Amino acid sequence: MADTSECQSDKTVKEEPFQSVKTRKRRKNDKEEEMDTVESRARPSFPPVKAQKLAGGKSETRKIPVPSHRYTPLKENWMKIFTPVVEHLKLQIRFNLGSRHVEIRASKETSDIGAVQKAADFVQAFILGFEVEDALALIRLDDLFLESFEIADVKPLKGDHLSRAIGRVAGKGGKTKFTIENVTKTRIVLAETKIHILGSFQNIKIARTAICNLILGSPPSKVYGNMRAVASRSAERF
């Protein structure tokens, strides 16, 4: 009888399967994997919110006044302005003949929140006197800005003194202006006593300093030297 009981106990020992004991780290990893799979299944997908919905259902608008001397250039280049605003930014644009304003409005297809402001900056740059190709950079790039100031803001000049200051900034045949543009990678418009600069923040700062020095009476050669030194330093920094 004792032998039979021993045999039965041996059988039960042999029949019991071997159970692998998991370490704490492994158990934790398994739990994390299970949680990830559950989260991925239950994770909702939210489509991007339309710009019109963010504005509370109202379509955002901008109105840019057009001075009389820019009517003809606007008419000649209208398709170059119209195409990127409508096709690329998905906005609505028109020229109001009654109020003499370019009106820009968001549509149902507009997805970018800042599209209306980009288009307004683009049109404003053209109205100020920049070429359409240069102004288009305001739509394509995010880190470009427009800055405007008057010569009187730098130094109160009148008569011939003012004319000479404008001449120093422009240079013979526009040479000085082109040099500043090429070195600082900006675009400059001289509109009577107003100066408009288009470019990145750092480059506008360098160009503005050079123009201010010319207005204050510094010789062009000295201004070129200082400007190139500052531009090379900023290029090395970035």
Swiss-Prot record:
It is found in: Nucleus, Nucleolus. InterPro entries: KH-I_PNO1_first, KH_dom, KH_dom_type_1_sf, KH_PNO1_2nd. One of its GO terms (biological process) is ribosomal small subunit biogenesis. The keyword Lyase does not apply. SMART domains: KH. The keyword Transcription does not apply. Pfam families: KH_PNO1_2nd. Residues 8-17 have a biased composition (Basic and acidic residues). Residues 1-65 are annotated as: Disordered. Residues 159-211 form the KH domain. Keywords: Nucleus, RNA-binding. GO terms for cellular component: nucleolus; nucleus; small-subunit processome. One of its GO terms (molecular function) is RNA binding. Part of the small subunit (SSU) processome, composed of more than 70 proteins and the RNA chaperone small nucleolar RNA (snoRNA) U3. Belongs to the PNO1 family. Part of the small subunit (SSU) processome, first precursor of the small eukaryotic ribosomal subunit. During the assembly of the SSU processome in the nucleolus, many ribosome biogenesis factors, an RNA chaperone and ribosomal proteins associate with the nascent pre-rRNA and work in concert to generate RNA folding, modifications, rearrangements and cleavage as well as targeted degradation of pre-ribosomal RNA by the RNA exosome. Positively regulates dimethylation of two adjacent adenosines in the loop of a conserved hairpin near the 3'-end of 18S rRNA. This is RNA-binding protein pno1.
